[in-house]
């Protein structure tokens, strides 16, 4: 069975219809139909411009615009029939427009190609998606600031190599994720700036012979600038790759955060409690409360990384200008945007609801000689070289391992066997509070600095 070639806008050159399987294989309407709002937006701007330069009459423009608005309403009401034989979102909408308003509908495509049309649609769509994602990042960051302020004095162990390193505050830890998300936000803002160049008017690849006004169309569609080269305009997908790169970094951050949450909820850590609404159980083990949300976010990072690699591979061998390969740009881009937005939404809902277990985190911070560096710094202030202090404290830690005593649990006599510079005042620096309070500088873990960082973060978010 084959399709009727008269269904195709380009059928005039062909002597036989496209094979039915090939029609399905080459069609993109099953996934690019989500561009319909932006396709209609671009078409309305294009028709408005064509009327201004005299290619369309004002009456024709109005008929086209009314028809397109009606089609959008049909789509949003679920009354639009998407046809695979019409290939894509563009031809489906154009065919329906012609059905509704007659021959005037066939004039809409004057001065443009699907090549610059789809390049415009994707940029418009991604611009809106980035705005939604930025709002979710901000919402998540607000939740992190809530936790950081609430838990600015809550002490927990800080880790390197997943081994106890130094005491930090839970609030300070939350602010580390705030910083990462700020960089993610900035990358996406930069990506949005670069993608906001209008390719419409590039036509198939060389521009058009019609007296188009690209500056008008650019203004109507909210682009910052008109693209400077028609070949590049229809073939450029850097913006999609850049978005997937920024999305991959953001998902990497969320994946790392997820790993910590999974660890912290485990019976081996028990640092935090996740509300039941963010967890699931087991079909066989009645006791289980599984942290599915962070686990899924951790797993979904691979989808976004794959989208980035897929787009890089897609583009690496293409000559100028447009090639059918580019039809494959949409599904990975769509999936990357959906995955990042949904992951951010899940985290933005979950993070403010986390309940730290203060006593357990404090007890964990008391294990592992987390104030060893503080003892070394104490000896430095007594006039000893740091490397000598490092050696001295190393011996003290070895003694603690052998005797089962933390540094703060040793007597002054025991500590002085490693250095006669140690006096009674050493115990003030060996406490958890003494350790975190001593890091009282910008970027440090002292509660005072955590609260100051929260204030700066709130000011940053208020300025967006």
Swiss-Prot record:
**GO BP annotations, alphabetical order:** arginine biosynthetic process via ornithine; L-arginine biosynthetic process
Pfam families this protein is in?
ASL_C2, Lyase_1
Supply the InterPro entries for this chain: Arg_succ_lyase_C, Argininosuccinate_lyase, Fumarase/histidase_N, Fumarate_lyase_CS, Fumarate_lyase_fam, Fumarate_lyase_N, L-Aspartase-like
Q: What compartments host this protein?
A: Cytoplasm
Which ranges form a coiled coil? none
Q: What is its main location?
A: cytoplasm
Signal peptide range in chain numbering = none
EC numbers listed for it are: 4.3.2.1
GO cellular component terms given for this protein: cytosol
In the UniProt record, does the keyword Lyase occur?
yes
> At the top level of its lineage, which domain of life is listed?
Bacteria
A single GO molecular function term of this UniProt record: argininosuccinate lyase activity
Q: Which reaction does it catalyse?
A: 2-(N(omega)-L-arginino)succinate = fumarate + L-arginine
Similarity remark: Belongs to the lyase 1 family. Argininosuccinate lyase subfamily.
Name this protein carries in UniProt: Argininosuccinate lyase
